[in-house]
UniProtKB/Swiss-Prot annotation:
Organism taxonomic ancestry: Bacteria, Pseudomonadati, Campylobacterota, Epsilonproteobacteria, Campylobacterales
Positions bound to [2Fe-2S] cluster: 61, 96, 154, 221
Organism: Helicobacter pylori (strain J99 / ATCC 700824)
Protein's name in the database: Biotin synthase
InterPro entries from the UniProt entry: Aldolase_TIM, BATS_dom, Biotin_synth/BioAB, Biotin_synthase, Elp3/MiaA/NifB-like_rSAM, rSAM
Matching NCBIfam families: bioB, PRK08508.1
Family per record: Belongs to the radical SAM superfamily. Biotin synthase family.
Pathway where this protein functions: Cofactor biosynthesis; biotin biosynthesis; biotin from 7,8-diaminononanoate: step 2/2
Purpose of the protein: Catalyzes the conversion of dethiobiotin (DTB) to biotin by the insertion of a sulfur atom into dethiobiotin via a radical-based mechanism.
Pfam family, one: Radical_SAM
Residues reported to bind [4Fe-4S] cluster: 17, 21, 24
Amino acid sequence: MQEIFLCSISNVRSGDCKEDCAYCTQSSHHQGAIKRYKFKDEKVVLQEARALRELGALGFCLVTSGRELDDEKCEYIAKLAKAINKEELGLHLIACCGRADLEQLEFLRDAGIHSYNHNLETSQNFFPKICTTHTWEERFITCENALRAGLGLCSGGIFGLNESWEDRIEMLRALASLSPHTTPINFFIKNPVLPIDAETLSADEALECVLLAKEFLPNARLMVAGGREVVFKDNDKQEAKLFEYGINAVVLGDYLTTKGKAPKKDIEKLLSYGLTMATSCH
């Protein structure tokens, strides 16, 4: 039976981001109706880590809103990493904190972070259409810095932003050049507060995107993330095809500002597809 890796997310700093990413409700440019807070309490993060690990999650990603890492965020993430690792839960810790230089990433590595997540989101050519406050090249350099720091790299993108198939191929080719160990695959869901006017991808087109990703990234862990609940709805037959077409990792629980599937019910559904849950990160 196919083994599936479960990863979970903790939004440890939410909202008030000064970047203008057109797909993100955390941007202060869009005034999304989301929870906003500076730093989540350490005790709450530890409770989340314990609960999600008990459900079977092996990856735990600490996400901060904002353009980039700074000294305060570095210290905060390092503190969380040390506290979680002290629990000996066996979690693979990922940080997702925006643009970062080599020194910052080495600091996080030494504090106990195992991987860094920084998505390319789309192609270099299409990126200026969805963000003007930073460049695609900055994202790519941060990914390179993570690798140079000796961290694992988690990097992927979003499908359904009105990009072309050529853009999708260009993004996947760039990702392949980085050889990430994990590639999150997100499907954009239309939101009235966001400026992107794009219809939700059909399940068939989403599956084609997965097939394409598998072609370019045969050795990466392909992780279905945001948008799965809407694109596949209650269509179990189509959702099961995700795993036939190359998906071998799933985000368990909620996303940054949107609800995911209820973890226990989601796991029951995955088991009904004949999948098994990985018990080790390796």
